[in-house]
Design a protein with these regions (language model features):
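Short alpha-helical
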Residues: 18, 43, 65
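A generic structural motif
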Residues: 30-35
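Alpha-helical interaction/dimerization surfaces of two-component signaling modules
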Residues: 25-29, 47
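Non-catalytic signal-transmission and effector/linker regions of two-component phosphorelay proteins
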Residues: 1-25
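Acidic, metal-coordinating helix/loop segments flanking the phosphotransfer/catalytic sites
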Residues: 37-55
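Structural motif
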Residues: 12-17, 39, 58-62, 85-86
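Flexible, charged surface loops at secondary-structure boundaries
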Residues: 3-7, 49-52, 76
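Conserved phosphotransfer microenvironments
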Residues: 54-80, 86
């Protein structure tokens, strides 16, 4: 069996640049690329429609909603793994 390397696309949804900056070192570009950072639920919904992500990190609460409904919708409608951080 041949091992194939894979990179995972990541969407980070957070109102805080501090959170995004603290998570980025945990996501090396060799394994996680591209990493997209958005700052609102509405922007995240637009990105999810346009791009298929493997992993979605939601740092709740967000300015326009808590984030739970977004997490449920992404889990229901895509194959992405979702982590809701409160």
């Amino acid at each position: 069996m041949v091992f194939q390397e894979r990179t995972y696309s990541v969407l980070i949804v957070t109102a805080s640049d501090t959170f995004a900056n603290s998570v980025m070192p945990l996501l090396p570009m060799t394994d996680y690329w591209p990493v997209t950072i958005v700052h609102s639920i509405s922007e995240a919904r637009r990105r999810v429609v346009d791009t298929e992500f493997d992993i979605v990190l939601i740092n709740a609460p967000l300015p326009d909603d808590f984030g739970m409904r977004l997490a449920i919708d992404i889990c229901t409608n895509s194959g992405a793994g979702v982590l809701l951080l409160v």
